[in-house]
């Protein structure tokens, strides 16, 4: 089965950056998606590139509007099928790295989970 790839910008320099990593880890632990190394993609790693070529879906998850994950993916030749920006999509103000609200993790997980659903994509439910 082809992987559902998550490209996550988890720099940990803000609460929304930290949130991207926490939510992605939860989905990876549940076997719902695979987190790909964004730095390896930026460095042109052939293994990461091959796996992304074979991925069923690619979702970029960024914390803030700088959209580093999406931009790195696009520059590497892998435009994501969906691009999420947690600060925008969940209405969370960017703040210090440790200021992640416990209530925000399940909200982020659900947003990413919906973006990964092939059915939602086919029906045009995910913008």
Please identify what each model-predicted range represents.
Residues 1-127:
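Iron-sulfur-associated redox domains of electron-transfer enzymes in respiratory
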